[in-house]
Amino acid sequence: MKDSYISIVIAYLMVTFILVSSMPIEGEKGELGPHRLPCPPEYANYCFNGKCVHFVAQDEPGKPCYSCICDKFYIGKRCGTLDLTNPDF
């Protein structure tokens, strides 16, 4: 039972990663959308292998929420991990 639970969690994480990594960052007019903004210049190197995005809707008072949209084959909070499980690798 534990193995099937782990398999389900891994499958869920892989699907989530695929969905997030395939999301376009910029819209047709070069806008990130109403809840996403480009990160300020001081965060230009925040993501190791991806693009930094400021998620305004998730900000806490005095604590902005920055996240990364990872390049292909990279995962992790700051896109610092090479995804060797990707079948296209």
Swiss-Prot record:
It comes from the Eukaryota. GO terms for molecular function: toxin activity. Residues 1-30 form the signal peptide. Keywords: Disulfide bond, EGF-like domain, Neurotoxin, Secreted, Signal, Toxin. Expressed by the venom gland. It is found in: Secreted. One of its GO terms (cellular component) is extracellular region. Disulfide bonds join C39-C52, C47-C68, C70-C79. Residues 43-80 form the EGF-like domain. SUPFAM superfamilies: EGF/Laminin. Belongs to the EGF domain peptide family. Ant peptide with probable defensive activity which acts as a potent agonist of the mammalian epidermal growth factor receptor (EGFR). Mimics, both structurally and functionally, vertebrate epidermal growth factor (EGF) peptide hormones. In vivo, intraplantar injection in mice causes long-lasting (several days) hypersensitivity of the injected paw to both mechanical and thermal stimuli. Its long-lasting effect is unusual for venom toxins whose effects are usually immediate. This is OMEGA-ectatommitoxin(02)-Rm1b. It comes from Rhytidoponera metallica (Australian green-headed ant). The lineage of its organism: Eukaryota, Metazoa, Ecdysozoa, Arthropoda, Hexapoda.
